Amino acid sequence: DVVSQTKEPTPEHSWAYPFEYQKLGSVVDYLVLMGYDYSSTFSPPGPVAPNDWLRAVKAYTISQVPGEKVILGLPFYGRHWTVEPDGSYSEGRGIKYKQAMELASEWRVNPVKHESGCLYIEYKYPDNSCEQIFFEDKTTLLEKIKIADGLAGIAFWRLGQEDESIWDYL
C-alpha cells in the first residue's frame, strides 16, 4: 500500500511543517526526501540542492524519523536561467550535465564550484544580461552522498541527466 499525505502550507510554517514526519515515519517502510528543487522553475536563480540545506533537511528529518527509514533524493540535473540587466529572470529550465558542459565549452567559460557545493556557470552578454547554470558533477554529487551517511540510502532524479562518471562510484 502507498501512503500519501498532503497539507496546504501556511505562512507561519517553514518547509518542514506541511508533513507530520513522526506519523509518517511510524507507518512507512521508507521515507524518500526530495532533496532537490531548493531553487526551482519559478524561483530566482540558485542551486538545486545546496549542501547546507541538505544537512538541515536531514537533521530535521532524523529528529522525527529513524535514519534507517530515510532515503535522500538527490539531483542528477541542474537549472539554467537567463537574467536580464534589470534583475528579472526567465523560468529555471532543467538542464542535463552534458548540456551544461557543452554550453560552457561554447561560451569558453569554466564551471566553478559555487559556495552551495554545486557547479556554477555564468556567461555575460554585452548588454549585461547573462546566463546562469547551477548543476552537479561527480565530485559535487559525491559530497552530497556523504551527507546521506547514516540514512537508509539515496535516490536520484532523473536518470540520464547525470555526469556518467558517477556510476564508477555508486
Sequence positions of predicted segments:
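Second-shell loop/turn segments in exported
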Residues: 41-48, 130-134, 156
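Glycan-binding loop/region signatures in secreted carbohydrate-active enzymes
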Residues: 74-145, 166
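Acidic/aromatic/glycine-rich contiguous surface patches that form carbohydrate-binding/processing clefts
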Residues: 140-170
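Extracellular/periplasmic catalytic domains that process cell-envelope and extracellular macromolecules
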Residues: 23-27, 63-66, 113, 124-127, ...
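A residue-level signal for beta-strand positions that form part of recognition/binding surfaces
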Residues: 69, 132, 153
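Substrate-binding surface in catalytic domains of secreted glycosidases
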Residues: 1-105
